[in-house]
């Protein structure tokens, strides 16, 4: 069975980020940094300069989307893998690269940092970025523990910085349409049951189980649609390929 600590983290993650969840996408993230209602244009004087830490599987997609977003430009990429850095340079010759993420978080020429690395490294990198005055965009899952998540939120609030998690499904047309139907003056009626299944998606992770890897998607959708906290839960799981990490789970 999955531990209570593991399951409660995922539920708490959705609850913690309710106040900022609407700002998760890049198009929403950028105006928030400068307290503007309209998306910044590339020809405006202000351009959000973003450093991306991690250029493995998901990092290239984040870099592409940032560079396709008005008002933003990736100016630096950090990755421990030299081949990954070379790929970034070939794709974007104007981007600087480095092996040490500290070079990015300490740079005065970077406004915000996107953390696209294994979850075990999220806390250290995000904390360092905040301490160096950078806004932070973190790939899900946010951190490894509730205490780490709360510490990062407190650090951001103390410094009046933005920190948010990449709950991408909250901005898909289907999820937003469901939200619209649910909230349309009771047109649908009272919602009694919510069921979500996520199967056969991607590789097995070496550092987190399937709940930590995939459940944040479903839990963030549930939190967005229902806006209610759970009263109780039951969870079970099994590990078939790695005896320490469950690859099948039911909550």
What role is predicted for each listed range?
Residues 2-14:
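Extreme N-terminal basic, low-complexity initiation segments
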Residues 19, 143-205:
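A contiguous active-site-proximal alpha/beta segment in oxidoreductase catalytic domains
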Residues 29, 42-92:
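N-terminal Rossmann-like dinucleotide-binding module
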Residues 62, 92-155:
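Beta-loop-alpha module in the N-terminal Rossmann-like domain of NAD(P)-dependent dehydrogenases
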Residues 201-251:
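Rossmann-like dinucleotide-binding domain that binds NAD(P)(H)
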């Amino acid at each position: 069975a999955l531990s209570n600590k593991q399951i409660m983290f995922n539920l708490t993650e959705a609850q913690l980020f309710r106040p900022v969840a609407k700002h998760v996408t890049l198009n929403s993230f950028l105006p928030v940094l400068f307290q503007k209602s309209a998306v910044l244009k590339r020809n405006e004087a202000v351009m959000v300069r973003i450093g991306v830490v991690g250029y493995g599987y998901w990092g290239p997609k984040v870099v592409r989307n940032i560079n396709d977003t008005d008002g933003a430009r990736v100016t630096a990429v950090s990755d421990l893998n030299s081949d990954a850095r070379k790929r970034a340079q070939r794709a974007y010759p104007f981007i600087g690269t480095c092996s040490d993420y500290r070079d990015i978080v300490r740079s005065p020429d970077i406004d915000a940092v996107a953390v696209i690395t294994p979850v075990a490294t999220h806390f250290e990198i995000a904390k360092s970025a905040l301490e160096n005055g950078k806004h932070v965009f973190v790939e899900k899952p946010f951190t490894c523990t509730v205490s780490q998540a709360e510490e990062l939120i407190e650090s951001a609030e103390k410094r009046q910085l933005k920190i948010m998690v990449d709950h991408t499904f909250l901005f898909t047309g289907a999820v937003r349409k469901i939200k619209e139907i649910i909230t349309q003056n009771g047109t649908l009626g009272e919602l009694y049951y919510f069921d979500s299944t996520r199967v056969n998606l991607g590789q097995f992770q070496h550092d987190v189980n399937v709940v930590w890897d995939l459940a944040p998607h479903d839990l963030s959708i549930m939190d967005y649609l229902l806006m209610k906290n759970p009263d109780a839960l039951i969870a079970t799981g099994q590990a078939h390929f790695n005896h320490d990490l469950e690859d099948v789970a039911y909550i």
